[in-house]
Amino acid sequence: MAAHKREIQQDIRELGELLGEVLKEQASQQAFERVESCRRTAIEYRSGERDSRDSLVADLEGLSPHHQRVVSRAFTTYFELINLAEERERVRTIRTDSHEGTLADSLETAADELGEADVETVQRILDDVLIEPTFTAHPTEARRKTVKAKLRDISTSLETLDERLLTEKEEEQVWRDIDAEVTSLWQTPQVRNRQPEPEDEARNVQWYLENTLFDVVGEVYDELDDAIDAEVPADIEIPKLFEFRSWAGSDRDGNPYVTPEVTATTLERQRSVILEKYREQLKRLSGVLSQDGSRIDPGSAFQAALERDRERLPGSARTAQERYPDEPYRQKLKLMRERLDRVGDVRPGGYDDVDELLSDLEGIAHSLRDNGAESVVEGHVDPIRRQVATFGFSLASLDLRDHQQKHTDAIAEALERAGIDYTSLSEDERVELLTDAVLQDQPVIDLAETDDLSEDSARVLELFDSLADWQTEYGVEAIDTYAISMTEEPSHVLEVLFLADQAGVVSLPEHSGIDIVPLLETEYALSGARRIMGTLFENEAYSQALEARGQTQEIMLGYSDSNKENGFLAANWSLYKNQRRLGEICDDHDVTMRLFHGRGGSISRGGGPMNEALLALPNSTVTGQVKFTEQGEAIAEKYGNPRIAERNIEQMLNAQLRARKQAIDQPEEAVREEWLEAMEQMADAARQEYRDLLESEGFVRYFEQATPITVIEDLNLGSRPASRSGERTVEDLRAIPWVFSWTQSRCILPGWYALAAGIDAYLEGEEPRSSESSSGNETREDGGSIEMLQEMYDKWPFFRTTLDNAALSLSRTDLEIAEQYANIADPDLRDRFFQRITAEYERALELITEVGQRDELHARDWLGENLEHRNPYVDPLNVLQVHLLEQAHRTDIEERTLRLTVKGIAAGMKNTG
């Protein structure tokens, strides 16, 4: 028997050896030897033999284009396999820690903390909490769907190897299966030859919801049930705690390919998928609920519900009675499956909404409890009921999104027919016009009349015209949110309210079928958040719409664009302090705030450990409801493996429960005024340094020459263009390719640059430019103290999380590799910018370790601990990429190799944008 315990080193060794054999078979012995030579030389270089770098460069540049492609493919495939081995190790660690009772951030630890409160407070916390992960189609996933499917098969085989009772023959067969998959993977194109369509992106998101999260959510609820029961000495009702949402197939911002037809197809496919999942669940439940009607009393309420179904579906009822003559629960379940079949069908008798299905499940549960079958309810009925409450009839509710300028232009063109020059109106005049139009009974524009409009404006009106039909067909909850990119004025929100009103989606004061979500992503918008939201809350039309939506306002914060505009430290501070301001304005108007965090996968775009981010939010903003984006490769990493998905969901719930309790116990967190002043000072100086870099003459050319941005723009990662207008400026470039490019060059500038400038400004006593007492950057006689920064790090979760995230970016930065990219650039640009970046990096290293009082930069990060192992395998890909970028004219095979190096480096860094 193969009863040994596998370890990651064994997995890495055996997978590496297997890849070597595949390389010999599929390429040649010579190719294998060239790859091995590059690997050994890279290891020697990382071991301190500095001359080895020149040898590595010479070896790779001396290869033929064919062998360069083989080397690139070999290292890329290696990382794909090693990432699977690391995933398996994560699962093993989770299982071991769980078994030993040492699992951090578990539901048990959250329940233990909740147990300190009285029963009413515990129930309040649970009732307040709603977590809404929102899957987006943002193009940061560099792998093809076909490649991901093969990797999942290999992952399944690795999981099988962890079983203790495999015979030697069984283990040999598993390795033969892995060999076959790796061979197939080698022979499969690694890079997309076409741009994915929005339907592809929607199907990708759907896969994780259908195949992982549908089952995982039920398991998390079960764990929470057990944990609460153990700590709280009273009956506690566990409400709906999760709601999954998606932008895939409905996010139109900058993507002309997301049409009403795409959105309609996505809605229909998602409903079909979830209804089939429920039918399967009810069929399995029917295998359990075989109770004899002569031995139990189902109860009058159950019998009445069954009789109503018989009247709705007489033909199906006769079939059910003939098949299950003495089994009332099976009869009921058979008719419930038939009603699911008829949802959205022309045939009568289907469920009108998900509440009817929930009512049927609760009726069965009540009947079973009355007959002493509580264990059957807990083990079989409650899990289905919670799945239905979580996923509804839509699998994931869709959010619509578009740029505010599109709405402004569409309204201006439509109103021009009535002789109204909307573009000439002031902001106050626009607010007045839109408010009056919403409050009056008669429509102002005809959404169906689009012949004389521009293409973009016609698309906007067609969308709102379709929205009412979608809500009628699929239910309001299937598509009930509209996010507005680049919101900077109250009129930008009222424009969407106006269009929704003209479509009949809103009919005030009684009904509003849509949450309108301002996306605040520029410094102007963030600093003006109080002005924007205050105007809206006091507006007659908007306040009625808000009341019709339960007096809850969702506000989205854009981490990506604010970071690109202001730099890492200034963006984080602006988001933090403006969240506090938003919390205050919502409290002043008795509005429940739900913050929507537009976070990317990388630190530079708001990424980092989600549980730590939730606990670092200002207490005054933690209402219990929270929403955040899940993007690109982060979706696969977090939700591809069921056990890891469960762990991520568990950590989110742990953090949100604890954060809500903390907010109730202490509505205002204990943050000293001098800390806030220090942060203002640091952020202001950091922003000045960052903007000075970006606005320096020649910087955009340096960025173009010292990163692979031109390659990334052509990679077919997503269905939308890399820049909003097609131009190459830092302002217009989307945040994802901006971050992706710096990550590829190993500089990772957006994740840490100007942090040191900010901290040094505080230590040297430089007054912030925003200070009322200062007309410019002046120096005070008394500088700041490193001791206070250390105290802030120890006692202020926001500051600690910010520095820890910067440390994570710094730990992944490699300026020796980045220098090779800089050397491609014009020598004058290189000398000006790379030296400046290097000086800031070195000072940041000193300050991070001093403030955090630690010897190592980021010892707590699991990936950071493995960088030493990974670097020798990423280095050859970087060297090869630099060599190919230097070529003025590349052959077709060199272009394909260059694109493959991008994919390989992304796999090696476990990060794109």
Spell out what each predicted region is:
Residues 1-427, 456, 831, 835, ...:
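Often metal-dependent polyanion-binding catalytic scaffolds in large enzymes
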Residues 2-6, 13, 24, 50-74, ...:
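Acidic, glycine-enriched catalytic cores built around paired aspartates
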Residues 18, 22, 38-41, 74, ...:
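Generic, well-ordered alpha-helical scaffold segments in large soluble proteins
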Residues 119, 123, 129-154, 174-190, ...:
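Structured alpha-helical segments in the cores of large, soluble enzyme domains
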Residues 203-204, 212-245, 250-253, 462-480, ...:
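Secondary-structure-rich domain cores
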Residues 239-241, 245-247, 255, 385-386, ...:
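Beta-sheet entry/capping signal
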Residues 258-289, 502-688, 889:
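Catalytic or ion-translocation cores adjacent to nucleophile or general acid/base/metal-coordination motifs
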Residues 400-404, 481-489, 515-523, 599-602:
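Conserved short loop/turn motifs at secondary-structure junctions
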